[in-house]
Amino acid sequence: MEYLAGNYDVIVVGAGHAGCEAALAAARMGGRTLLITLSLDNIAHMDCNPSLGGPAKGHLVREIDALGGQMGITADETSLQVRMLNTGKGPAVHALRIQSDKQAYHLHMRNAILGQENLVLHQALVERIKTEDGKVSGVVTRTGAFYAAPNVILTSGTYLRGRIIIGDTMYEGGPNGQQTAMNLSGALKELGLELGRFKTGTPPRIHRRSVDYTKFTVQPGDSVPWRYSFMPTQSMFWGRDVDKQIPCWLGYTTPETHQIIQDNIHRAPLYSGKIEGIGPRYCPSIEDKVVRFADRPTHQIFLEPEGWNSDELYMAGLSTSMPEEIQYDIIHSIPGLEKAELLRPGYAIEYDYVKPYQLSLSLEVRKIPGLFTAGQLNGTSGYEEAAAQGLLAGINAALRVQGKEPFIVRRSEGYLGVLIDDLVNKGVKEPYRLLTSRAEYRLILRQDNADLRLTPRGREIGLVKDERWAAFQKKKAAIAEINALWRGTTFSPLNEHLAEVLAGVHSAPVHGGISGEELMRRPEITINEIKQLIPQLAEYDEEALLEAGIEIKYAGYIEKQLAEIERFAKMEERMIPEEIVYDQIKGLSTEGRQRLKEVAPANMGQATRITGVTPADISVLLVYLEQKRRGGQIHAT
């Protein structure tokens, strides 16, 4: 029997990485928020790899932090190892990767939720979304509890009709054998949402004592304690020193490994027809790699620790859903793992997702006001992509409570904007992974300047609190002082110390006066050389120095990208009226008309990015809108 169990402003269903960020954001912005999860013991659980970051993903974590989110803080606090990737390339693709303690991460995030004002946590299984007059009115649990709210955020991850597959064995379940939400998919279909089916997987876990590490190559962390959070007081490694980091280990499969897989490929669910869902392109299973890259004799695998006090090793690169007995053979064929003890077998999981073309850029379902979806439910892969969507959905649900306009991040403002724009306008045919190559303005969207790009916007909506804002203002002031210092410092060509420093890095001698800024523009000159010449720079934080240096070195390229952004902004400003009827526009292609109706773009810029809409369609649409404007049927924008 259904009964009223409570009234809230925002209800979040699912406490994975998306749900946690959504609930915390909504509560921190003043919304009375309820977070419902299948299990209090699995909040923010890392069901797959025990790490965060890497190219584009690390950028996202920094953007989440810059806006006032939680992921970066929790990742720093519970880190096992830190590495800055791509340091041999340009700053646009420098990316932090943090190895995390799975259990510690879960506990730290749960404590953040339990300690958050305006946020209530509850364990239950949601089976229905209730609506009234076409708008969301709340959710109903399996036990009949009705929680009323005008805003509901679904962040159910891979739990919608989840099905675990290990060889010939298949059963209903979520990740790691958790219960799954079998009825919610049907409820969403009844609301008119179109769902799809995807697949993902995870590798086996082995006992660390059973590895012969002499046959692996150690992968230590960096000596610099890199952080995700821009908060200068953020601690790391559970309070341990940087030299106490736990290493990862690099190994390789062998021709024997590949032969075992090839001999049993008929038993692989991926090839036997047992798996219906489409899997992630950028994280293929080992059996898929062996088939697709048959000419390669080996593939890399990494043994990654899962915690300070855990005996489990995650086998990155060895994702599989082969039968369990074949998994033993595969593992034991790898040098150093001849006696490996299998703790958990790898598996594949199929699940339902919401096709994201049905969403607005605020992640609200267009046809059901007050209903938001975020995370893997929207067809993405990865903790970071999920958390970023959750943050945005939580922000917009809170703003809706306040009667304010949605918070939209443009492609030129952040990887978060690239992610959402791609999902809504291009859709997904496979689990979506964010890549630096998907961003047009990579040099603007660096990981080091995420706070300069987004923290002021987080402050405007009330998510960035006073302590973070003060740290941001201090960094901005430091950058201004650094710029003034090296612009105002001039060196004589007779300066012997200057000549010595230049010779040390094979930089050409100067023949006239030269400023610190001009020196910094030289490719071979780094912050280290400038600090030798201007000792006062040693007083400043390394992050502020790095930021100021990049802005000078790449000034020309940055100016070009800013000009491109300004030109494209004019298209973004050309609004498309909500009442437009695409069936009345002659000259549109059949596919273009269909896609424009599905996505309902808010402006011409968005329309140009919709898959299936051609340049000819855009020209037709522009002419139509101009004719309507001149006829007085559309207001000029």
Swiss-Prot record:
<feature type="binding site">
    <location>
        <begin position="279"/>
        <end position="293"/>
    </location>
    <ligand>
        <name>NAD(+)</name>
    </ligand>
</feature>
<keyword id="KW-0520">NAD</keyword>
<keyword id="KW-0963">Cytoplasm</keyword>
<dbReference type="InterPro" id="IPR047001">
    <property type="entry name" value="MnmG_C_subdom"/>
</dbReference>
<dbReference type="Pfam" id="PF01134">
    <property type="entry name" value="GIDA"/>
</dbReference>
<dbReference type="GO" id="GO:0050660">
    <property type="term" value="F:flavin adenine dinucleotide binding"/>
</dbReference>
<dbReference type="InterPro" id="IPR049312">
    <property type="entry name" value="GIDA_C_N"/>
</dbReference>
<keyword id="KW-0819">tRNA processing</keyword>
<keyword id="KW-0285">Flavoprotein</keyword>
<dbReference type="InterPro" id="IPR004416">
    <property type="entry name" value="MnmG"/>
</dbReference>
<feature type="binding site">
    <location>
        <begin position="14"/>
        <end position="19"/>
    </location>
    <ligand>
        <name>FAD</name>
    </ligand>
</feature>
<dbReference type="InterPro" id="IPR044920">
    <property type="entry name" value="MnmG_C_subdom_sf"/>
</dbReference>
<dbReference type="Pfam" id="PF21680">
    <property type="entry name" value="GIDA_C_1st"/>
</dbReference>
<dbReference type="InterPro" id="IPR026904">
    <property type="entry name" value="MnmG_C"/>
</dbReference>
<dbReference type="Pfam" id="PF13932">
    <property type="entry name" value="SAM_GIDA_C"/>
</dbReference>
<dbReference type="InterPro" id="IPR002218">
    <property type="entry name" value="MnmG-rel"/>
</dbReference>
<dbReference type="GO" id="GO:0002098">
    <property type="term" value="P:tRNA wobble uridine modification"/>
</dbReference>
<comment type="subunit">
    <text>Homodimer. Heterotetramer of two MnmE and two MnmG subunits.</text>
</comment>
<comment type="function">
    <text>NAD-binding protein involved in the addition of a carboxymethylaminomethyl (cmnm) group at the wobble position (U34) of certain tRNAs, forming tRNA-cmnm(5)s(2)U34.</text>
</comment>
<dbReference type="InterPro" id="IPR036188">
    <property type="entry name" value="FAD/NAD-bd_sf"/>
</dbReference>
<protein>
    <recommendedName>
        <fullName>tRNA uridine 5-carboxymethylaminomethyl modification enzyme MnmG</fullName>
    </recommendedName>
</protein>
<comment type="similarity">
    <text>Belongs to the MnmG family.</text>
</comment>
<keyword id="KW-0274">FAD</keyword>
<dbReference type="GO" id="GO:0030488">
    <property type="term" value="P:tRNA methylation"/>
</dbReference>
<dbReference type="GO" id="GO:0005829">
    <property type="term" value="C:cytosol"/>
</dbReference>
<dbReference type="InterPro" id="IPR020595">
    <property type="entry name" value="MnmG-rel_CS"/>
</dbReference>
<dbReference type="InterPro" id="IPR040131">
    <property type="entry name" value="MnmG_N"/>
</dbReference>
